[in-house]
Amino acid sequence: MRGVLHKELLLYFTSVLFYVVATVFLLLAGYFFWTNLDFYVRFGGMNLVRGLWQYQFYDLRQLLLAMIPLLTMRLLAEERRLGTLELLWTYPLRDWEIVAGKYAACMVVVFALLGGTLVYPVVLSTLQPVQPGPLLAGYTGLVLLAGAFVACGLFISALTDSQIVAGTATYGVLLLFWILTWNEAALSEGALRLLVPFSLFDRFQVFATGGIDTRDVSFLLLFTVAFLAGTLFALDARRWRGVR
């Protein structure tokens, strides 16, 4: 697993794509923070969590939804295209080590991106006290959400040898889970009750407002595990078929 992790981190941090994604992510995150802070200042007296951090976390989750498919699209699709997946199988590596190494590498990149946004509460703390609890809850939600996104992207990347297809399909699948309950008026009460538990949008709401619900934590972890298990199944099926 360490070998896969080191290789993937090297590929990430020496690729132009990472620096493009990081630049766009941090510039947009900074812009959103500035506009949210301006809104908070203009409407003085608002609760800091609901007046600033809630909207900032909403904006960051949107950025993760857009950027993570770009980070995961090559993880296994490129190995399939180049035929190097079979080469990995010649090493003393089990499938779970390959999957875990690639997943961990992408999560390190996500941590780096989110780490860059920690400057905002640090700067704000020089002007007024900042409660750590709501921030911890919000970032916990972002990490869990990002973990679920990465697992989904890794699974889809295992199904194709095209990075473009993998990235586009990942974004489409995640967006579907995101907007499941947006058009509530068009859904029956039974359908709404069935779909709400699977809505990633709804699962993040409590985190953004400074709370942590164990049901949301459990769902996001199960979502992640399910897609990682699917990735293992896809690799195992490919190994047994013996095709490229």
Per-region residue spans from a language model:
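Aromatic- and glycine-rich beta-strand/loop motifs that create alpha-glucan
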Residues: 1-22, 244
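Hydrophobic alpha-helical transmembrane segments of multi-pass membrane transport/permease proteins
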Residues: 16-38, 59-67, 172-176
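Secretory targeting signals
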Residues: 30-34, 50-58, 100, 104-164, ...
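Terminal transmembrane helical anchor/hairpin motif
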Residues: 35-51, 166-239
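Long, hydrophobic alpha-helical segments
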Residues: 55-78, 113
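Hydrophobic/aromatic residues in alpha-helical transmembrane segments
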Residues: 68-72, 120, 151-152, 230-231
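Transmembrane helix boundary and interhelical loop/hinge segments in multi-pass membrane proteins
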Residues: 69-89, 103
